[in-house]
């Protein structure tokens, strides 16, 4: 067997790329099926790696969950990082209806992780808390930029509204709660800006 064939086999099954395949499979499985419902065997199989290779990259399933959350954190953690819109538009964009493509709505991956990790994965819980705080801080910063009289209050109200919309959409598998939340957000934002004038 040539060295090239051995290298190709190592790359396709383990080796370089294995860590990313594990994280990609984790993102799909943890979100769609849940963290606790996804066993290490299934995660390894979906990643096309052995359990041994999985454990060479991650010390435990909790470590996989932590890295999965860190890998998606930047996409959702700070709404103030969005560009190309006014602060008010960026606040409202948080409430755009997510598209599930026919799949069941699963809500916020960080909320889901908090529920599934309760008491058993302190590292996961800390990542979730930090992400949720950063999210609320981002909303507060946008509220300040939009001219809200009390930006911290508005940021916290919008964070609670977001969590409620995500939870209700997930519970009912119905995205209409996002439109209702957006309408409520418009009212809150406009009142907060008007009260400053």
Predicted feature locations:
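Basic, helix-initiating cap at the start of DNA-binding domains
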Residues: 1-33, 37-49, 62-63
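Amphipathic alpha-helical packing segments from all-alpha helical-bundle domains
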Residues: 81, 89-93, 121-145, 156, ...
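Amphipathic, non-transmembrane alpha-helical scaffold segments
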Residues: 15, 23, 65, 69, ...
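Hydrophobic alpha-helical connector segments
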Residues: 67, 78-106, 155-158
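Hydrophobic alpha-helical segments that form the core
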Residues: 150-171, 180-188
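Amphipathic alpha-helical segments used for helix-helix packing
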Residues: 102-126
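Base-recognition residues in the alpha-helical recognition helix of bacterial helix-turn-helix
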Residues: 31, 41, 52-59, 67, ...
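Hydrophobic packing within well-folded, soluble alpha/beta domains
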Residues: 22, 26, 40-43, 54, ...
């Amino acid at each position: 067997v040539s060295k090239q064939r051995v290298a190709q086999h190592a790359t396709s099954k383990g080796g370089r790329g294995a860590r990313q395949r594990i994280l990609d499979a984790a993102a799909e499985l943890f979100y769609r099926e849940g963290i606790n419902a996804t066993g290490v065997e299934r995660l390894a199989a979906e990643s096309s790696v052995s359990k041994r290779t999985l454990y060479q990259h991650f010390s435990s399933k909790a470590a996989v969950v932590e890295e999965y959350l860190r890998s998606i954190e930047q996409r959702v953690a700070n709404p103030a990082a969005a560009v190309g819109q006014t602060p008010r538009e960026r606040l409202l964009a948080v409430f755009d209806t997510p598209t599930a493509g026919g799949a069941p709505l699963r809500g916020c991956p960080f909320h889901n992780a908090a529920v599934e990790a309760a008491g058993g994965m302190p590292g996961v819980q800390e990542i979730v808390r930090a992400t949720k705080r950063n999210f609320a801080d981002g909303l507060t910063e946008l509220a300040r930029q939009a001219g809200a009289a009390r930006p911290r209050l508005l940021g916290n109200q919008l964070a609670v509204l977001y969590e409620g919309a995500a939870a209700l959409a997930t519970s009912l598998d119905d995205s209409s709660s996002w439109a209702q939340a957006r309408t409520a957000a418009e009212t809150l934002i406009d009142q907060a800006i008007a009260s400053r004038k």
